[in-house]
Design a protein with these regions (language model features):
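Short catalytic/metal-binding and nucleic-acid-binding patches
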Residues: 1-173, 178-183, 196-227
């Protein structure tokens, strides 16, 4: 995949997975650590925090002195990979942020699990969101990733209401924040997308429509799935 040029205020779909498709999140603490890093390392003034110990709580007061490298518009963490929707705010902001995020989490994970070596499958992948099809469907695609954990595609035994309930129970994404249920509100910047999707209730309707017409929408973004 050709690497895009990162430019100011442009939106990108960023993703990566564990080396050899290994799990990169083994327990609740791992998910919380990565999300904690999404917040604390999104700062021009902060270097990578490699400490094993950290607070699970995100201090809202810290945001007052932050100089954001990127806006985190949406995210989903899966057992062996992650998806981020980022808008660059500082020169070279995405590269700086992803370097700090990857290094910081890898060192935490290796220290915790007494392992050595790379954790991720090479450099992060990036796709520029530069057309309407991507722009309208990528946020929901990112948020619906957890449904693959229940093997929902092609299944006739699980209806769309059950799938939505599953998404509401899955904490490790920004989906809940977009439907009006606070989960990790300090991490994301949601006003832009909520304006595009005309509010929380309408985004919920869009999500339900996505689930009902999964194969149709997947065809529109089949060039950005993990390979």
């Amino acid at each position: 995949m050709k690497k895009p040029q990162f430019t100011q205020d442009q939106i990108y779909h960023i993703y990566n997975r564990g080396v050899e498709k290994r799990k990169i999140f083994l327990d609740k603490q791992d998910y919380l650590r990565f999300i904690h890093n999404l917040f604390t390392l999104n700062n021009e003034n902060i270097i990578t925090n490699n400490s094993y110990d950290f607070s699970n709580k995100l201090n809202k007061n810290e945001s007052k002195s932050r100089k954001l490298l990127v806006e985190i518009l949406a995210f989903t963490l899966m057992p062996n990979h992650f998806h981020l929707l980022l808008r660059q705010k500082e020169n070279n902001g995405i590269v700086k942020f992803m370097q700090k995020l990857g290094t910081g989490y890898s060192m935490y994970f290796n220290q915790k699990n007494k392992r050595v070596g790379g954790l991720f499958q090479g450099r992060f992948k990036a796709v520029i969101i530069d057309n309407d099809a991507h722009f309208w469907h990528i946020p929901t695609y990112i948020h619906l990733n957890p449904l693959s954990l229940i093997n929902y595609r092609g299944s006739t035994s699980i209806n769309y209401k059950q799938k939505i309930e599953f998404l509401k129970q899955y904490k490790w994404s920004s989906f809940l924040d977009y439907i009006g249920e606070k989960n990790f509100p300090s991490v994301i910047s949601k006003d832009f997308l909520l304006d595009v999707f005309q509010g929380e209730k309408n985004y919920m309707k869009i999500t339900a429509d996505w689930i009902k017409n999964d194969s149709k929408y997947l065809q529109k973004i089949n060039d950005i799935t993990l390979k």
